[in-house]
Regions:
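Structural beta-sheet core signal
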Residues: 7, 33-35, 116, 139, ...
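A short, glycine/small-residue-rich beta-strand->loop->alpha-helix junction that serves as a flexible
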Residues: 7-20
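Short His-centered aromatic/hydrophobic patch
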Residues: 95-99
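Conserved donor-binding/catalytic core segment of Leloir-type glycosyltransferases
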Residues: 175-183
Length: 183
């Protein structure tokens, strides 16, 4: 039985594109699915991914809307717990951002292995919040700004993520016979 991996993403292309690359690298060996918010959908081909939409609103700074947003977040946490349990998820990979909060909290409650991915050189607030609970955080550098020193042992430095087709072997018989040199 393959392990079930859920990739939580959304928001900007800076979160979604790395999630799609991770998805494609894992899909042959694991049962992979992905969640995104509505903003992240525009970066995804829905037919290409096992995708579920979790529309998470940012918590408002408006004092009148804050209680409403808090109640919505509680509902989404329960929805996330139900989703994680129902789908028997073994590993949650979060690309950060507030859209991952309910699923990461659900994973923490259900004791599901949590892996974080930080696509930036400055540690994001969501990843900073969950750094204590995660097993590893994948970064492009050991020198991520605002990273707590006591959790440096959790960093796993990885090379820049590339789509699988960049690794495919090229047919050497298909090479160019002539080379144009522009001077």
């Amino acid at each position: 039985m393959n392990k079930k991996i859920l990739i939580s993403t959304g928001g900007s292309g800076g979160h979604v594109i790395p999630a799609t690359i991770i998805y494609k690298h894992l899909e042959g060996n694991f049962d992979v699915s992905m969640t995104s918010d509505l903003r992240g959908i525009k970066f995804l081909n829905k037919d290409e991914y096992n995708l579920r939409i979790f529309n998470v609103r940012p918590i408002s700074k408006n004092l009148l809307l804050m209680p409403f947003d808090f109640i919505l977040m509680i509902i989404l946490i329960f929805k996330s717990i139900y989703f994680l349990r129902k789908n028997k998820i073994n590993i949650l990979i979060s690309t950060g951002g507030y859209m991952s909060l309910p699923l990461c909290i659900g994973a923490k409650i259900l004791n599901i292995k949590l892996l974080l991915f930080e696509p930036n050189m400055v540690l994001g607030r969501s990843n900073k919040f969950f750094i204590n609970y995660c097993q590893k955080i994948f970064c492009y550098s050991n020198n991520v700004k605002k990273f707590p020193i006591k959790f440096k042992n959790k960093i796993k430095v990885i090379p820049a993520l590339l789509r699988k087709n960049f690794y495919a072997k090229r047919d050497s018989n298909n090479s160019l016979d002539a080379i144009n040199l522009l001077i």
